């Protein structure tokens, strides 16, 4: 069928899910993979490019917030940001390779900020009791500054302490499932006002990222914009990526097809249109011809864009199958 090649991981008897985990104990998480390997299965959607531009040299300060429900691609996007920070040269080369395909020469000039350490975590996994535990554990200078914090006998780290640590090693903190984690925090934990302390520390990180972007980038994902978790970040006028742009649906389809097939983009639109012409004509006759106002060419283009699936099946794959967690 026009030489279309399914990616190897989908050729077995049991198809894996495509849900992304930033890190897994078996080192099979998205951030555990080599950047070239992960970028190979990544399609540069408009939202992803917007997020990458938030990492550019000379960028404005402030948090970056990804807003969207299940299956929107937030975790995949965050994994790309992680690799971009830790491997900027590889990411810039990848962008350059896509510049001609997308007819966007500006991608050749997109330069990722250098010198940051990415610290990424699906925070709702609850591997850490507090955000500062995560930072002290993963940051290159974390052990020293953890000692300073413990010696201070304070209930949360001082802003000056965190700024010193970030100044020694600039940091990009990426927190997936931030709202899920925050909403589940208890009011009290081991005598500590856990939610209040988290609220205060989030505010601190947001302010540092706004006022001192040269030492801290702060990126989180939330499900919606009416939660306490989001409102705390909203004070610092974050960049919002909401997956609701004009091209979001088409981008999502292209992302899925690129994720499933190795060479879908290498097959010409003319060949696809020729192959699907009869089906597209009958689909239009059965579903749209009685409505009077449907654009036949637009409907045919929709069929070509979704090939090798029908538009209805691709929607089903996205909603019910591909976005489920692998068993």
Residue ranges and their predicted role:
Residues 68, 118-127:
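A short hydrophobic beta-strand->loop->alpha-helix junction that borders the nucleotide-binding pocket
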Residues 81, 176-177, 213-226:
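A short beta-strand-to-loop transition that corresponds to the Sensor-1 phosphate-sensing loop
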Residues 82-117, 145-156, 196-197:
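Flexible phosphate/Mg2+-sensing switch loops adjacent to catalytic phosphate-binding sites
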Residues 158-167, 192-217, 240, 262:
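Substrate-engagement module of ASCE P-loop NTPases
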Residues 165-195:
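Conserved P-loop NTPase "ATPase switch" module shared by AAA+ and STAND
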Residues 225-327:
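Amphipathic alpha-helical segments of the small helical/lid subdomains adjacent to P-loop NTPase cores
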């Amino acid at each position: 069928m026009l030489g279309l090649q399914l990616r190897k991981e989908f050729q077995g008897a049991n198809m894996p899910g495509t849900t992304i985990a930033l890190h897994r104990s078996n080192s099979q998480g998205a951030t555990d993979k080599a950047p070239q390997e992960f970028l190979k299965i990544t399609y540069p959607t408009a939202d992803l490019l917007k997020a990458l531009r938030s990492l550019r040299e000379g960028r404005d300060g402030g948090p970056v917030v990804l807003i969207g429900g299940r299956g929107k691609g937030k975790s995949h996007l965050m994994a790309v940001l992680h690799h971009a920070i830790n491997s900027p040269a590889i990411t810039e080369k990848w962008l350059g390779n896509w510049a001609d395909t997308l007819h966007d020469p500006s991608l050749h000039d997109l330069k990722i900020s250098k010198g940051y350490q990415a610290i990424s975590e699906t925070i709702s996994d609850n591997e850490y009791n507090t955000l500062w535990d995560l930072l002290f554990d993963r940051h290159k200078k974390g052990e020293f500054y953890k000692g300073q914090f413990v010696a201070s006998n304070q209930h949360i780290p001082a802003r000056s302490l965190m700024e010193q640590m970030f100044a020694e090693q600039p940091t990009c903190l990426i927190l997936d499932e931030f709202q899920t984690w925050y909403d589940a925090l208890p009011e009290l934990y081991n005598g500590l006002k856990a939610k209040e302390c988290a609220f205060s520390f989030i505010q601190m990180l947001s302010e540092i990222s706004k006022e001192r972007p040269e030492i801290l980038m702060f990126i989180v994902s939330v499900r919606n914009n009416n939660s306490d978790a989001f409102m705390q970040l909203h004070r610092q006028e974050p960049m919002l990526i909401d997956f609701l742009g004009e091209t979001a649906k088409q981008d999502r389809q292209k992302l899925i097809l690129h994720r499933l097939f190795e060479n879908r983009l290498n097959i010409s639109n003319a060949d696809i249109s020729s192959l699907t012409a009869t089906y597209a004509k009958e689909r239009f006759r059965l579903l749209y011809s009685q409505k009077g106002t449907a654009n036949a060419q637009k409907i045919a283009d929709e069929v070509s864009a979704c090939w090798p699936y029908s538009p209805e099946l691709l929607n089903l794959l996205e909603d019910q199958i591909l976005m489920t967690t692998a068993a």
